[in-house]
Regions:
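Acidic, proline/glycine-enriched N-terminal capping motif
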Residues: 1-61, 65, 69-72, 346-347
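Acidic, low-complexity central loop/insert segments
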Residues: 22-24, 30-31, 76-199
Length: 347
């Protein structure tokens, strides 16, 4: 069965997916299994999320950061009680596989590439009947967005309705399991994600991304755990500073009947200075043309924006995801200045 952007009517497919009456065969992820009795404590020590007590059948999101706290990998994790299953973007999977293999040392873990064995099927309703059973657990990843995982912190106050499940399905059984089901293309799934303000590794993450900029402290970071690469930077920005950029949702002017491209530049309306870029675009079945953009923190939250598209300038209005004042949550008291007493000169 082919992965398709749409099957002829993207907006109807999107509504069906939203209502839970269809499935989406997702772009192929890289899939890595980590088995062995040390797997959870080992992954816990390497990644941003608290994984030590992940129960069989539970899922989580975690980040692999560089030493400066920039996002290298967004990782979806399912544990079945014997094996942890990691899903990442296909183009990044070999890098993660190599790095995990290098970090094994004497830990009792086995790291294996399982990409060719599985496909990924998304829906807004969980269906254990189509998911692969491993150690009697259906392998289903539940997206924690827009909630707040234990130990997380959400900057956004935006209210969204978003339930999303990704089922690991045996690649050889996809046709059998989905052949008689209503299907939606990947454009439908992406539009629902954008409407929810949900960042993706393929769209929103670049080489400069900090978790704070994308509101990923809510779902992928446990702020009370340490000892993982990049942890000091995460804590410093969250407690004492502000992320330099912020994720925002955009309502686009649809009068030109065209969407901007990913990477198109964004500026404040009426000004020349570039303040950010488009990271994801879609046509929503209710809201019309929408996008996500990463822009400078200094851009006012209520100012109108313009997107410099290939077919012309597109007007855009913001709906705040990460606010301008995100970060600096530590309440550090200011010490009173000490007045030095002593004789005045010339007295």
């Amino acid at each position: 069965m082919q992965i398709k952007e749409h099957f002829g009517n993207p907006l109807i497919e999107q509504r069906n997916l939203f209502e839970g009456s269809s499935y989406c065969l997702m772009n192929q992820p890289g899939i890595i299994s980590v088995s062995g009795e040390d797997r959870l404590s080992w992954l816990h020590s390497l990644l941003s999320q608290n994984l030590k007590n992940l129960a069989p059948g539970d899922s989580a999101e975690a980040l692999l950061l560089d030493p400066q706290g920039h996002v290298e990998q967004m990782i979806k994790i399912i544990d079945d009680g014997q094996t942890s299953w990691l899903m990442v973007n296909l183009e990044n999977s070999q890098m993660l596989l190599d790095w995990l293999t290098k970090m094994v040392f004497r830990m009792k873990v086995v790291v294996t590439n399982r990409t060719d064995e599985f496909s990924l099927v998304g829906s807004t309703k969980k269906n254990p009947e189509i998911a692969f059973l491993s150690n009697s657990q259906p392998l289903i990843w539940k997206d924690p967005w827009p909630g707040v995982a234990p130990g997380g912190y959400r900057y956004s106050t935006r209210k969204v309705n978003y339930d999303w499940f990704e089922h690991m399905v045996e690649a050889k059984k996809v046709e059998e399991l989905l052949g008689n089901q209503a299907l939606s293309g990947t454009m439908a799934a992406d539009a629902l994600r954008i409407a929810a303000g949900r960042p993706s590794a393929m769209g929103e993450v670049d080489e400069k991304s900090l978790p704070h900029e994308l509101d990923l402290l809510a779902t992928a970071v446990h702020l009370s755990k340490g000892c993982y690469r990049g942890q000091e930077s995460v804590a410093k920005v969250h407690n004492l500073g502000h992320p330099p950029r912020r994720l925002t949702f955009l309502h686009l002017d649809g009068s030109e009947h065209s969407l901007p491209d990913v990477g198109d530049q964004v500026r404040v309306s009426g000004e020349e200075k570039i303040v950010g870029k488009i990271t994801s675009t879609g046509q929503h079945f209710e809201m019309g043309p929408i996008a996500l953009a990463v822009i400078s923190r200094s851009v006012a939250e209520d100012v109108a924006l313009e997107v410099l598209g290939s077919s012309g300038v597109i007007a855009a209005t913001q709906e705040v995801i990460v606010p301008s004042d995100a970060g600096k949550v530590a309440d550090i008291p200011k010490l009173p200045r000490l007045k030095l007493a002593g004789p005045k000169l010339g007295a």
